[in-house]
Amino acid sequence: MNEERWNRREILAGIAAVAVAGGRMNAEGAVQQRVLGRTGEKVSCLGVGGSHIGKPKLSDDDATRIIRQAIDHGLNFMDNSWDYNDGKSEIRMGKALRDGYRQKAFLMTKFDGRTKDSANQQIDESLRRLQTDHLDLLQFHETIRFDDPDRFFAPGGAAEALTAAKQAGKTRFIGFTGHKDPHIHLYMLELARKNNYQFDTIQMPLYVMDAHFRSFAKLVVPEAQKMGLGILSMKSMGSGVILKSKTVAPVECLEYALSLPTSVVITGIDSQQVFGAAKQDGAGGQ
């Protein structure tokens, strides 16, 4: 079998692998749900990572099958971004969410524009690619430099675009992401308080080695909890670097992130590591 093509059994194996971690499937065989912070929305504890969906190793049909099979088995949280794979990730997800699947999904995307004008342009482009008139969650992407929070809240900055998008009904909820330094996240939250600006979600890397260096779990998660934010976890496997040590399995990495007060752990269900774990754990037939 061509390793770059996924059939129905393999897709289900991947879903099963991430869902069985810690008993994350309910009695009906669907992935369990968690509450997304103060929004009160119920979302799947595992999310489909949009970055993987647009990669060349997958065809458009592969991407559609993965997304729809995931939704059919309770993974309703869809992650994406304006800049993933030059827009291909959003285009593929938009096609996959036709035929009634958009109504079953909790759809999130992100934008990179630092100014109001550039952000507005990217938001509208994302809506067109995703073939929808609104998002469930829209996030400011890659808060990774210490001046990013200042730029976000500056006059004419992206904060104005995010607020306008919510007021116009282009998104139900708003948040921000970053993966570089927990102190940048904390500074963003500090400026949000000073500006009386209310985020609904916060996204950050949470993985097994996090506690040893620039720990988001120790520094940011408690603050996010105090503010009632929905906590989104990414990079649970350290972009694959952690797995190269062969000291932990993919499912163990996922279980660590799920053990934290996260609402959603975003992962690439099409990855070789996940499918390998499914076969190893005997979950392929479930």
What is each residue range found by the language model?
Residues 51-60, 110-116, 244:
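Active-site mouth loops of central-metabolism enzymes
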